[in-house]
């Protein structure tokens, strides 16, 4: 790590370093990058106006960090970080947990009814389905269910890489069940996240204690403009200095 061979370091070591230099979780300074601002603007618009939107961007462009910060500061906003192994019940149980609902048991029908009933009581709720491209088709169909039941009351934002757009367009073209409806409900529009810039990375470095210009340039080059990578490289620099 001290010699700059950062690509060879395993995840476990990065976690140890993060703990050791006091930069876990809340100690990492969030910077309003171009991607952060766009993601936040979409979430605000969707929640205030009960809109349904789809946002796509490269991995590491800052979508999830902006979402996490938004949810911490806005009532009735729920962040689902999806996983490939989720089935229908896993999806619904995780949404129940994010909403603070105690009862996460019952049939799929029961869970849907409980969630809809709870959301109908809330003022301007927002469901954020992060990494939606990891969901199987049958789970992604829940998007249609919640849209139909909560239209004009609950905002829904699908977030993913560009693969989601390709998948939905291809699904509609091949007349696969549900994809035409999904495409229609997001307004046939996928909002693109802006590319991370060197200025974004420099601002992140400076906000987190790295102000040496050479170090910032090195981090920028090695990061491939992936903000998760930037965080790791900042940790490594602080450890070696």
Regions found by a protein language model. Name each.
Residues 80-84, 168-172, 176-183, 187-199:
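Conserved AAA+ ATPase "SRH/arginine-finger" region at the nucleotide-binding site
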Residues 118-139, 143, 147-150:
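Conserved P-loop NTPase "ATPase switch" module shared by AAA+ and STAND
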Residues 1-50, 236-241:
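A short, basic N-terminal segment
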Residues 18-22, 89-105:
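Conserved NTP-binding/hydrolysis module of P-loop NTPases
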Residues 47-69, 83-84:
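Walker A/P-loop nucleotide-binding motif
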Residues 190-215:
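Conserved small helical "lid"/interfacial subdomain of P-loop NTPases
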Residues 54-59, 135, 147-178:
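Sensor-1/coupling segment of RecA-like P-loop NTPase cores
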Residues 215-229:
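A short helix-loop-helix "switch/interaction" segment in the helical subdomain of ASCE P-loop NTPases
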